[in-house]
Curated annotation (Swiss-Prot):
Protein name as catalogued: DNA repair protein RecO
GO biological process, alphabetically ordered: DNA recombination; double-strand break repair
Keyword DNA damage applies: yes
Family: Belongs to the RecO family.
Cited PANTHER family: DNA REPAIR PROTEIN RECO
InterPro entries cross-referenced by the UniProt entry: ARFGAP/RecO, DNA_rep/recomb_RecO_N, NA-bd_OB-fold, RecO
Any one Gene Ontology cellular component term annotated for this protein: bacterial nucleoid
UniProt cross-references to NCBIfam families, sorted A to Z: reco
Entry keyword set: DNA damage, DNA recombination, DNA repair
Function: Involved in DNA repair and RecF pathway recombination.
Pfam families: RecO_C, RecO_N
Database matches in Gene3D superfamilies: Nucleic acid-binding proteins
Length: 242
């Protein structure tokens, strides 16, 4: 059955000389895989250049019951980027976040609040002109709410440890595992949780501090998501914003 929907590109893979497989997070059906024809004709209904990391696509596809790949018939951009592909910092963030979402978001069902969050966040990054060095940290922290992984931050007291495995603060160092962060870093985590896109530029961080926060968040997700792999784009992102 032909249906129109919108999607955010997470991953592409060459299928053969005339097709690619594109994983998108869609407004209609959540995480979904599509077979996309990429003919060389300028008049083609689908162009491969559309499917860059985090690109917004409006498309029509044949959603057949029990299929694992849905064929895309027509596609176009519904929000052409103005800065992300042309800014090396933003494009590196987009590459990392697309890979992160590809590995973390597996739900194959409609989740319009999550789609709206992704759309709002990526458009915000594209339109922002300065002060976005902490964007990926805020994005990942807020994403945890949608995945049911948001940590319990209500019972924080100065000097607490943060237990990564049990997602909570604790006054004593965990004895049964080593997945925790020390009190000094736990205090910074709470500070990070107060950030949003509009205020994050007020929280100054060195590259080392930002890298450490990213490492902690990546470790946290790997603890709580089965089979979450090491991300190839993580090291590239750590080198940004000296």
């Amino acid at each position: 059955m032909l249906q129109k929907t919108k999607g955010i590109v997470l991953h592409t893979l060459k299928y053969n000389d005339t097709s690619i497989i594109v994983d998108m997070y869609t407004e209609l059906s959540g995480r979904t895989s599509f077979l996309v024809p990429v003919p060389r004709s300028r008049k083609a209904a689908v162009k491969s250049v559309l499917f860059q990391p985090l690109s917004f696509i409006e498309f029509e596809a044949d959603f057949r019951p029990n299929a694992t790949l849905y064929r895309v018939k027509e596609a176009k951009s519904f929000y052409p980027f103005t800065s992300i592909p042309y800014d090396p910092y933003k494009s590196s963030m987009a590459l990392f976040l697309a890979e992160f979402l590809y590995r973390a978001v597996r739900e194959e069902a409609e989740n319009r609040p999550l789609f709206a969050y992704l759309q709002h966040s990526v458009i915000w990054l594209d339109e922002c002109r300065e002060g976005f060095a902490n964007f990926h940290l805020v994005f990942l922290m807020r994403l945890s709410r949608f995945l049911g992984l948001y940590p319990n931050l209500e019972d924080y007291h100065t000097g607490d440890y943060f237990d990564l495995l049990n997602a909570c603060f604790t006054s004593t160092r965990p004895q049964l595992h080593s997945s925790y962060i020390n009190p000094e870093e736990a205090g910074r985590l709470r500070q990070l949780m107060r950030m949003n896109y509009e205020t994050m530029h007020l929280f100054g961080m060195s590259r080392a501090e930002r890298t450490r926060c990213l490492t902690i968040m990546n470790d946290y997700y790997r603890l709580h998501l089965p089979d979450f792999p090491a991300l190839k784009s993580l090291d590239v992102l750590k080198e940004l914003f000296d």
